[in-house]
Amino acid sequence: MDFAKIVQDNINLRPHQIEAKAEIFDAWSKYDSVMLQMPTGTGKTYLFTSLINDLVCNYKREHKEINILVVAHRTELLDQISATLSRFGIAHGFIQGAREQHLWKRVQVGSIMSLLTEKNYYNVCRQRFDYIIVDEAHHSLADTYVKLFNLFPEAKKLGVTATPWRLNHESFLSLYQHLITSPQISWFINKGLLSDFDYVSIKPNSEVQRLVNNSEVASTGDFSNTDLDNTFNKQRIRAKVYESYEKFAKGRQGIIYAINKRHAANLAELYSSHGVDAVAIDCDTPKEVRHDLISSFKEGRIKVLVNVDIFTEGFDCPSVSFIQLARPTKSLALYIQQVGRGLRVVEGKEKTIIIDNVGLYNYFGLPDANRMWMYHFKGHEDVVHKDNSRLFSNECEFVAEVDESRFRENDDSSWCSGNIC
């Protein structure tokens, strides 16, 4: 395929998507494997589906056959990809779990966990995929993805992610030869393509911040969940989490990120005891129950979803107007993915409130800080991008605004009374 001559259908794409797609085709003329970085909520799935549509149409025009595989690691992502392919009228099959397979279809949507099982391995190898697209590609250094890439050395590959960053600072260059970066989050906010936000956090010298800083680190490189549970899943700290919600986000619909199932259940119970329609959800929540809870949330019948590692990727609900961070992490990728759930735009939403009860700002800066993604892509150590000064009140929190003044102080700091803030 001569990518320089490919006919692109850019109807319904925004300028940044059109530019990114052109850069992908140009990069494929020089490299076999490229990665695209684009912030959460700016249309990655729609973009690569448009690219798939271009490929399918151009191959048909030239009377050639084509096989495309789109890979993800979660059911929610696979369903989202399938729905977008259907919007484009692209016939596709599934390679996932017990789903019925239609391997004769030229586009396949596959779970990385299912593709290389003994049941599917032979059929996958027979497909001879010409293109492989990986969603949430910051996971693709895992052995399963490496094995998949090695099965199809001649295929063109595209990995898409908001965060080309690994907790161990591993380089992506072993899989991807080139990184295409999109504008920064601040650019999308200024263009009205992502939501403006206020950010509330604890002071760097607060007791909670000291507890976070002194928490045990697990072999994964992130904080130990057991230690976090022992330290932060206490009534007085949970009470401060609720008080901050009541002060800054009461009546809003949003998502809370908790440490583990017990922490999530305790927080949901606390919020419910104050009359807030809150439920806990985690990976062990039955699929049917999870679907019903998410539907109720999207329809507005549930105000607060307290989750454990569920709504970090592939969850699309633009009406979310507050995000509450109650789970410490050392992962920049997790931080950006979590706050990104609240930055989608929808009519009537002026700003998102981000309540940071565990001081992630003090590790990573604001969500829209300028990130040197090429630096992280190559595997260099972290740089905290705090390119704006901070203003604190005399108590324990600050509120950051995305506007010309950039920050404002908050004089009322009742939620920081006592030793924990």
PLM region descriptions:
Residues 30-52, 257, 281:
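Walker A/P-loop
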Residues 45-47, 63-87, 144, 261-262:
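Conserved Walker A/P-loop ATP-binding site and its immediately adjacent core
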Residues 79, 94-104, 120, 265-269, ...:
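Conserved helicase ATPase core of P-loop NTP-dependent helicases/translocases
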Residues 97-131, 142-147:
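Conserved helix/coil segment N-terminal to the catalytic DExD/H
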Residues 179-257:
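Conserved interdomain linker/interface between the two RecA-like ATPase lobes of SF2 helicase motors
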